[in-house]
Amino acid sequence: MSFRTIEWRDDSVIMIDQTRLPGEEVYNTYTDFKAVAEAIRGMVIRGAPAIGVAAAMGIALGARDIIADTHESFFRQLENVCDVMARTRPTAVNLFWAIERMKRVAEAGRDKPLDGIRQLLKEEAIRVEEEDLTICRNIGKWGATLIPEGATVLTHCNAGGLATAGYGTALGVIRAAHEAGKKIQVFADETRPWLQGARLTAWELVKEGIPATLISDNMAGFFMSRGEITCCVVGADRIAANGDTANKIGTYSVAVLAKENNIPFYVAAPISTLDLSLCDGGKIPIEERPAEEVTCIRGVDIAPAGVRVRNPAFDVTPARYISAIITENGIVRGDYRAGLRRIAGN
């Protein structure tokens, strides 16, 4: 990879600023947990796996800066750090998975000196990043088996290296197929209102030399109906026990169109994105973001002042529209409730 999404360096967190892409490749340095939380909230970093990594690193920064004379005081303040992280973005379950993982590590080290606990948290945050790279490569290897030679793959939003520690889930599948020598091309939905497809996915694909075509969101059905799309691959922010999947707003529309046109629709996500505590997607919390994201683009108003706006950041695709769910442990089809529990080791 020719870029790093996020890394721990010299007791700081370094992130590529995704709000500046594709025009500028800028890396920001964060030295306190509140700044990391704001970066997550402001979508400097986004994508469920990347948010999980950022949260873990933010907690490690917060733990480092806690001033405490007793373990009781330290753990009370650490809980506050975790609460700040938890309030950043409600839909991506990887955020809460990472927070709980860091809490367990701290609790397991409770008998150590405070500096020892801080060190454990730092090491765990780095481990979360390293594991994500391995997980995404495994997702890619499994998923590449579903991509035929000569395929044209449609993807929505950005589930690439920028949405993870650096390889990608949906784009990891595409990247792995490309690395295996398959001659494929990609259609990327622009993905309003944040334009993650236009700004981020297209940027990654061009950078990697993978043939890419950018389309607006309302063109997907047109190209499907003409037989120009072989399959669809998207990422996920939360997957319920029955396979219902929350992903970037507009994913549901793509899935329905794919079903209508008999096109396979695949979801690629790590096990950490599964939320088996939810029986179905109706229980997934959906983040609503500011109206300005819809009415303005790069500071330019594109709608009349005073118009009412709704801006849900995600929608839920029912499992019946999903052909398969690709994880690092394998591919699940059909009975998602049983298959996801099996592949998650539950």
Swiss-Prot record:
Keyword Amino-acid biosynthesis: yes
Binding site for substrate: 46-48, 89, 196, 247-248
Any one GO BP annotation for this protein: L-methionine salvage from methylthioadenosine
Enzyme Commission number, as recorded: 5.3.1.23
UniProt KW keywords: Amino-acid biosynthesis, Isomerase, Methionine biosynthesis
SUPFAM superfamilies: NagB/RpiA/CoA transferase-like
Record keyword Amino-acid biosynthesis present: yes
Secretion signal, residue range per the UniProt entry: none
One Gene Ontology term of the molecular function aspect: S-methyl-5-thioribose-1-phosphate isomerase activity
Pfam families: IF-2B
Pathway: Amino-acid biosynthesis; L-methionine biosynthesis via salvage pathway; L-methionine from S-methyl-5-thio-alpha-D-ribose 1-phosphate: step 1/6
Site (Transition state stabilizer): 157
Active site location: 237 (proton donor)
Reactions performed catalytically: 5-(methylsulfanyl)-alpha-D-ribose 1-phosphate = 5-(methylsulfanyl)-D-ribulose 1-phosphate
HAMAP family per record: Salvage_MtnA
Function statement: Catalyzes the interconversion of methylthioribose-1-phosphate (MTR-1-P) into methylthioribulose-1-phosphate (MTRu-1-P).
Family: Belongs to the eIF-2B alpha/beta/delta subunits family. MtnA subfamily.
UniProt protein name: Methylthioribose-1-phosphate isomerase
Lineage: Bacteria, Pseudomonadati, Thermodesulfobacteriota, Desulfuromonadia, Desulfuromonadales
